[in-house]
């Protein structure tokens, strides 16, 4: 397991995020053979189960990376599953972790992840009460507000109504909601992927404090990888991500719009024409995400943009493309 720091947006201003991958047993959907089609994260879960005490000690070790350092810092904890799943983290383990974070003045934001159906009022409330002066978000993987896309293209296992219920519980319990959306699930054209993201943002906006646009990358051992290998799926164009981010920030200027383009400029990640400029765009997206300053992505050189525009305007499917 691992942890690292990266430039990021912290409670609405530029700062640094400490990302911690907690060594739990991973997502229960994966354990019952119903993993999301794009996700291989649970395969990285430890083969030997860690004790709850060892997990707490691991968090302490990770926090040493920012201890005594001037912030602001966000601590974002991932489990390759759900932080609120009692099968991964016991309630007392969650409390111990939050009690440690409560004592760190340089940590202004805390983010945990959970599937919708695992969000429970008491579980969120007790954590929110431990860190009343910090920006505490529960990140929920909505992926799309279209239930058909969620079922056929993602195998999500829950619905938009489930998300709404979880978001309302989270707010009532005293925490904020971060909504994960997946840009361009399989079986959608580039145009439909962009439109699905925009429509999902509109539907989820009343329940959301922060949007995180997850730009699809190809993870090993997934259905997405199999379709990609057969040239029936192409990761999103970076221009699609830029389009969605600019549109979202202009439409909802008071919402925090985040995105981390994993693998930008590589064949497995979001890319345009696989030139060096793809990585420039990827870095610009990260700067926008950290600062919320649209100028980083509004003034990009339109390299390869004409190809993207042709594909989007004509609604071409990935298997119809000659070049990737």
Swiss-Prot record:
Top class in the EC scheme: lyase
Knockout-associated phenotype: Archaeosine is no more detected among the modified nucleosides in tRNA fractions, but a nucleoside corresponding to q0kN can be observed.
GO biological process: tRNA wobble base 5-methoxycarbonylmethyl-2-thiouridinylation
Free-text comment on the cofactor: Binds 1 [4Fe-4S] cluster. The cluster is coordinated with 3 cysteines and an exchangeable S-adenosyl-L-methionine.
Domain of life (superkingdom): Archaea
EC number(s) from the headed UniProt entry: 4.3.2.-
Single GO MF annotation: metal ion binding
UniProt keywords, alphabetically: 4Fe-4S, Iron, Iron-sulfur, Lyase, Metal-binding, S-adenosyl-L-methionine, tRNA processing
Domain Radical SAM core residue range list: 12-254
Cofactor(s) annotated in UniProt: [4Fe-4S] cluster
Function: Radical SAM enzyme involved in the synthesis of archaeosine, a modified nucleoside present in the dihydrouridine loop (D-loop) of archaeal tRNAs. Catalyzes the cleavage of the C(epsilon)-N bond of the lysine moiety of q0kN15-tRNA, leading to the formation of archaeosine at position 15 in tRNAs.
Assembly description: Forms a robust complex with the archaeosine synthase alpha subunit ArcS, likely an alpha(2)beta(2) heterotetrameric structure.
Family the entry assigns: Belongs to the radical SAM superfamily. RaSEA family.
Protein name, UniProt field: Archaeosine synthase subunit beta
Species of origin: Thermococcus kodakarensis (strain ATCC BAA-918 / JCM 12380 / KOD1)
High-level lineage: Archaea, Methanobacteriati, Methanobacteriota, Thermococci, Thermococcales
């Amino acid at each position: 397991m691992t942890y690292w720091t990266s430039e990021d947006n912290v409670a609405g201003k530029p700062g640094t995020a400490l990302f911690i991958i907690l060594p739990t047993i991973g997502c229960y959907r994966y354990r019952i053979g119903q993993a999301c089609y794009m996700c291989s994260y649970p395969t990285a879960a430890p083969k030997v189960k860690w004790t709850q005490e060892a997990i707490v000690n691991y968090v302490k070790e990770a926090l040493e990376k920012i201890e005594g350092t001037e912030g602001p810092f966000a601590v974002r904890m991932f489990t390759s599953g759900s932080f609120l799943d009692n099968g991964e983290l016991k309630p007392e383990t969650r409390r111990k972790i939050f009690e440690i974070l409560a004592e760190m003045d340089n940590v202004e934001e805390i983010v945990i992840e959970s599937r919708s159906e695992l969000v429970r009022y008491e579980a969120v409330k007790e954590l929110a009460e431990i860190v009343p002066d910090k920006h505490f978000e529960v990140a929920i993987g909505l992926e799309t507000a279209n239930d058909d896309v969620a079922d056929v293209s993602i195998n999500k296992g829950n619905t938009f109504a489930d998300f709404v219920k979880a978001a309302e519980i989270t707010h009532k319990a005293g925490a904020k909601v971060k909504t994960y959306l997946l840009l361009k699930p399989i079986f959608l054209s580039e145009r439909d992927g962009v439109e699905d993201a925009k429509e999902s943002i509109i539907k989820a906006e009343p329940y959301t404090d922060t949007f995180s646009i997850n730009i699809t990358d190809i993870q090993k051992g997934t259905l997405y990888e199999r379709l990609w290998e057969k040239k029936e799926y192409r990761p999103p164009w970076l221009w699609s991500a830029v389009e969605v981010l600019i549109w979202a920030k202009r439409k909802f200027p008071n919402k925090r719009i985040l995105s981390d383009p994993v693998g930008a400029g590589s064949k497995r990640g979001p890319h345009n024409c696989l030139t060096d400029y793809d990585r420039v765009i990827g870095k610009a997206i990260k700067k926008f995400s950290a600062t919320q300053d649209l100028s980083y992505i509004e003034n990009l050189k339109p390299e390869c943009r004409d190809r993207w525009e042709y594909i989007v305007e004509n609604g071409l499917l990935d298997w119809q493309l000659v070049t990737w």
